[in-house]
Amino acid sequence: MPLHHLMIGTWTPPGAIFTVEFDDENLTLKLVKRTEIPHDEPISWMSFDHAKKNIYGAAMKKWSSFAVRSPTDIVHEASHPMNHDPKASSPDTNTRAIFLLAAKQPPYAVYANPFYSHAGFGSVFSVSDTGKLETNIQNYPYQPNTGIHGMVFDPTETYLYSADLTANKLWTHRKLPSGEVELLGSVDAPDPGDHPRWVAMHPTGQYLYALMEAGNRLCEYVIDPATHMPVYTHHSFPLIPPGIPARDRETGKGLYRADVVALTSSGKYMFASSRANRFDLQGYVAAFKLRDCGSIERQICLNPTPTSGGHSNAVSPCDWSDEWMAITDDQEGWLEMYRWKDEFLHRVARVRIPEPGFGMNAIWYD
């Protein structure tokens, strides 16, 4: 089929879900639907359920749920407050719903992370028979200064790995039959200045990849088969060009921050991105070749992106082929499509959607 649909959310109000059509023969992108959702619940990170019948959203002060009947028929069904801490839902705090992960195996629970202040807990939601977010069944503790920004399951969905950006560590939990989780342990990031933001896992379950936001690097971990804890291999790869000025001369603040890491559908390649903190600078996207066991064989490229990426620059490989990868930015509001062919990355299409806060992560519907 030459036509594919992607859904994208926004960082700021008004809330909306944008459906974009990609034609892989004519190499075009076009906006086909803007679905209005609750005004104050823009979705900065969205995820499909296992069947792509529901979208779950990290929506400012809420966790939201939408039935997906077709690419252009998306219906809001539920919004749940952040109940892990009484202060989190207050309009006077900066606590924000930042990430969620939908289980692919029964009981299909959804795992949600707040960020900024009062973010020391993760939340687990059960779902209805149709996949709607239903009940907050667990609020499990990390630590008071935690700020989880990304999580991933191992292939068996027995172990959950969390990237704690603010506490600078990786956490490991075991999933119970109920969908709730219990703590196994945590490991500090290799460097005090790393701040892990995102994690991805190889299909073998043997290797974990941690993207370090402040460290602007990708660190490789092997999973200890006895403890299921990640062990740093001392292999890391740059997500901004080595030697580039990385800090503002006047303020000392970082000029770049790494964003997202994701594997291609075959598990043979992996993409990772970084953003710039000034609009006059560019972000970067890297590609890696993975060995069959999951270790990183080599870094293939580190290409500049057209803009800084803003809050985004999120890479989103399609889930049926290694050929297509989408990147979103919210500096200018672009969705761009890249082709990965013969280990070269080139842009084949782009569409600009000049709406407030567009665009956050893109998810592939078909």
Where would I find each of the regions flagged by the language model?
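Short coil/turn segments that connect the beta-strands within blades of beta-propeller domains
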Residues: 2-4, 51-53, 105-108, 156-158, ...
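Loop/turn-rich, solvent-exposed surfaces of beta-rich toroidal or solenoidal domains
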Residues: 253-327
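Conserved beta-strand positions in repeat-built beta-propeller and related beta-rich domains
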Residues: 8-12, 57-60, 112-117, 162-165, ...
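Blade-loop segments of beta-propeller domains
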Residues: 30-107, 300-302, 306
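Surface loop/turn motifs at the tips and blade-to-blade linkers of beta-strand repeat domains
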Residues: 35-40, 80-84, 89-92, 139-145, ...
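Short loop/turn segments immediately following beta-strands, especially the blade-tip
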Residues: 19-28, 65-74, 124-133, 173-180, ...
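Conserved beta-strand position repeated across blades of beta-propeller domains
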Residues: 47, 101, 152, 200, ...
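Asp-box/WD-like beta-propeller blade repeats and closely related beta-sheet repeat scaffolds
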Residues: 73-154
